[in-house]
């Protein structure tokens, strides 16, 4: 290769690298800020490595119902909710695989309402787009995304190129402002109170797509195998909810899941309001989810339940322990002030 050809190749490579960097920067700017309602990967990756005791997975039933800071206040156990809106088990598997690159929890707690979802739900784009870039994200797109969304997920300017009129200083600042851990730990605060006066829990119909259910079970098998390989315990819950499936459907789900992973602990809590101490006239956000007050009670109950099962808090650095104490106090103050205002 003569000097001219070599120079041309070097210029071409430099151009490609520069173009890739510019496209990456543009993608960061154009992609909307996302720090609630699941898929909070930036904050998760800022947690100190191997500092999380409990990893919560699932859909909005997970990130609305569990507040890890409140659980910490009640039990000393640290946790994070790495969930996503209407997240299917196939995506949950890839979330778990990615999450375990920086954390080694004692137990994974998966909220299992997603086993009743369709093959694809409404928030695939958000669930996958905010995953860290890498081979697992690419494999997740091919495995769990609708075919017509894959192009935009691989090249997200396809989705967001027309956002330039909506850009804010916060969008631009993402390029130079590093992400940080926060007090939410994947939890999303919702405070609406669902009116249940004179009513009782109503029936929820799961998807009738048997192919979707089989795919969800295949994903669960991979989740269970990954937990087994890593020496992590696995609990599947159906969280307290006013929209409940029939006992027969829950029985079938338990049989199917424990048939795949006999070591997994299945906890049907859909109608366990009294056991947990929930007030259905105050603690529900809507027909499906708990509100902030309900999440506080359920998170305290979850922490104590996990202690009873033999899990114990791991040792934390002085700095991280102080951060958890401060975060817990923030949420406890918010709860206490809200209760005082309501009384």
Which residues does each PLM region occupy?
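N-terminal Lys/Arg-rich, disordered targeting/topogenic segments
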Residues: 1-7
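Hydrophobic membrane-insertion alpha-helices, especially the h-region
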Residues: 10-28
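Membrane-embedded segments
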Residues: 57, 61-144
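Secreted/periplasmic serine-hydrolase-like ester/acetyl group-modifying domain
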Residues: 125-232, 314-343
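Flexible, glycine-rich surface segments
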Residues: 194-280
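C-terminal regions of proteins
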Residues: 251, 255-326, 330-342
């Amino acid at each position: 290769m003569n000097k001219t050809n070599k120079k041309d190749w070097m210029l071409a490579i430099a151009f490609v690298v520069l173009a890739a960097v510019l496209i990456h920067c543009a993608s960061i700017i154009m992609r909307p800020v996302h720090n609630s309602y699941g898929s909070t990967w930036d904050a998760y990756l800022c947690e100190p490595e191997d500092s999380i005791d409990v990893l919560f997975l699932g859909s909005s039933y997970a990130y609305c119902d569990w507040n890890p800071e409140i659980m910490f206040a009640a039990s000393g156990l640290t946790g994070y909710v790495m969930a996503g809106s209407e997240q299917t088990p196939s995506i949950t598997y890839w979330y778990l695989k990615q999450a375990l690159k920086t954390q080694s929890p004692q137990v994974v707690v998966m909220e299992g309402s997603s086993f009743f979802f369709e093959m694809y739900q409404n928030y695939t784009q958000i669930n996958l787009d905010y995953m860290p870039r890498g081979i697992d994200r690419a494999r997740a797109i091919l495995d769990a995304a609708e075919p017509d969304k894959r192009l935009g997920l691989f090249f997200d300017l396809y989705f967001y190129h027309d956002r330039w009129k909506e850009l804010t200083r916060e969008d631009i600042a993402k390029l130079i402002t590093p992400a940080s851990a926060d007090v939410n730990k994947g939890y999303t605060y919702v405070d609406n109170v669902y009116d249940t006066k004179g009513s009782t829990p109503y029936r929820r119909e799961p998807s009738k797509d048997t192919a979707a259910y089989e795919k969800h079970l295949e994903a669960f098998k991979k989740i269970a195998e990954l937990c087994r390989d890593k020496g992590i315990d696995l609990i599947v819950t159906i969280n307290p909810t006013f929209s409940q499936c029939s006992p027969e459907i829950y029985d079938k789900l338990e049989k199917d899941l424990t048939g795949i992973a006999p070591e997994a602990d299945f906890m049907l809590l859909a109608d366990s309001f009294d056991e947990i101490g929930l007030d259905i006239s105050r603690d529900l956000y809507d027909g499906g989810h708990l509100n902030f007050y309900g999440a506080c009670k359920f998170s305290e109950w979850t922490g104590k339940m996990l202690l009873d099962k033999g899990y114990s808090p791991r040792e934390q650095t002085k700095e991280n322990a102080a951060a958890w104490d401060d975060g817990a106090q923030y949420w406890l103050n918010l709860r206490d002030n809200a209760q005082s205002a309501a009384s």
